[in-house]
């Protein structure tokens, strides 16, 4: 009998146990990450051929206790390696674990290698070579409890998840053995259809089709670790291989065609999935089609039951989570609308995104996918008419969009607002950025029922997609939390993904995910346009310049010079990129990273046109003291007056609710202020006249 160890992914041990028992294996002992078992040579070969769950299968050679380096060398040398592999075979030692005398695993591997080579050298006056890339023989040592060493021979060669069929894949797919574990945990019945609406390289469907057609996972593998083992029984392996081939020939004929359907929005990915399925020999029973989740429908008759199984993107793979909520909302609604009495099984690393399915799971399984802790949730789909005919948010959004559409087209705008907390039950903002939509949710107070608020948010996401004809994949969700610390900006993610938005004759880089704000305020659109008109031949100063959008207009308006000042290095760099995007790169355009309040006190420069759009409050760590607009604006005006030329103009803009400047105080400074809010308020921001304010300020002559 052979003493063996089958390693597996964490969380799949019970599935591996069931699999090995079905093959006839006995004396099983489960540990975390694998199973010890005994078998004869026939069952050994069968477990290698048929295990869909195991990662590798090892022959356990010896377990011993080591107290020093000499013990390690002596115990390894005591094993008769010349009876295990030939001198002409290459080998590799993998050592796992450390203690007080084996400080790193490479040292442990080196001592082991020396002992093996010395044994061959002493017996044959020659030695086998080490191959770090593709060795014939792989020797594994695992150090447990500081001094208990397990030494094993890897009979698999390459990991067993490498079935040989998946030569084409996108990014980092789930390993085949983990995919099988997910399939087996999903509640799938082999006699019912399986649909993967985001199939990628097709792994779930191919593994399920292999199970259904009795196709052994090891059937296509050409090279195995045991083939270089001296005890390799070639005839017995041939028998196992021929038996597996015969089972597949019979099994594939019994399978129903089109019981496996895979969709993906990318035709190139679908081509790869088809090639993989063809390599596995199961393409004839899988249908791959180019289609996104928006267009997912049930193609089977009403009484047919089946399963939707998928591993949607969850932030780690492609995008940040806030870009993916719409995808999960759409998937949940589609499942409930078209797949009555089906099952839904979703594998994800994000419980946050899974909540947007708006479904209650009846089963949960926990797995490790590489370094990620993942969860598989299984749902029973009961009929629910998700196509609500009347919804107040949908009606209001539709009304707003129709009202604005003609104006949007005439102005040729790519960025605009279509909804701003119009309804008490839908306290959100909806902004359009070309083909993208950003939905900003104001965090509901604790007095509001969380489930109701969450349901309304999901409805808003879905109806935004419907009304604006936007791809569900192009909706970004953000939550605006009441800022107790009152810091101005906070980085949320680090995607560094930018899109270009056109506004009249200007272009801007916009980031929809990484910050609370995107880099472009649509409410300041006409202020920017006015600055472009006023800037011709002027020296222009932009204070609290943010991403420099106002500076771009001044530059395009042929300003004599521009100066942008902001305390944030991130936004100064962003400003420079926006200027470069508009071919404004000459030395007349200056960017200064500095505290604006300190800079206006110390500068000796004079300006013809000054734009200031200060925050309501700021207490940046880079500032010596906090800034409060209502408290400090008059002090700021005193210093602005000193740097404003005699015929100069200040455009003072604010987004602070109900803020008004004191005209009498301004007059005492020998300045004249005129409110111009009505002249520069865009049609998509008319409902917020108490928030957006602008004044034109000049010297009294």
UniProtKB/Swiss-Prot annotation:
Claim: Cytoplasm is one of the keywords in the record: yes
InterPro entries linked to this entry: 23SrRNA_methyltr_KL, DNA_methylase_N6_adenine_CS, RlmKL-like_Mtase, RlmKL-like_Mtase_CS, RlmL_1st, SAM-dep_methyl-trfase, SAM-dependent_MTases_sf, THUMP_dom
Catalyzed reaction equations: guanosine(2445) in 23S rRNA + S-adenosyl-L-methionine = N(2)-methylguanosine(2445) in 23S rRNA + S-adenosyl-L-homocysteine + H(+); guanosine(2069) in 23S rRNA + S-adenosyl-L-methionine = N(2)-methylguanosine(2069) in 23S rRNA + S-adenosyl-L-homocysteine + H(+)
A Pfam match: THUMP
Keywords in alphabetical order: Cytoplasm, Methyltransferase, RNA-binding, rRNA processing, S-adenosyl-L-methionine, Transferase
Record's subcellular location: Cytoplasm
Domain THUMP: 43-155
Function, in words: Specifically methylates the guanine in position 2445 (m2G2445) and the guanine in position 2069 (m7G2069) of 23S rRNA.
Name recorded for this polypeptide: Ribosomal RNA large subunit methyltransferase K/L
Protein source organism: Buchnera aphidicola subsp. Acyrthosiphon pisum (strain APS)
Gene (name only): rlmL
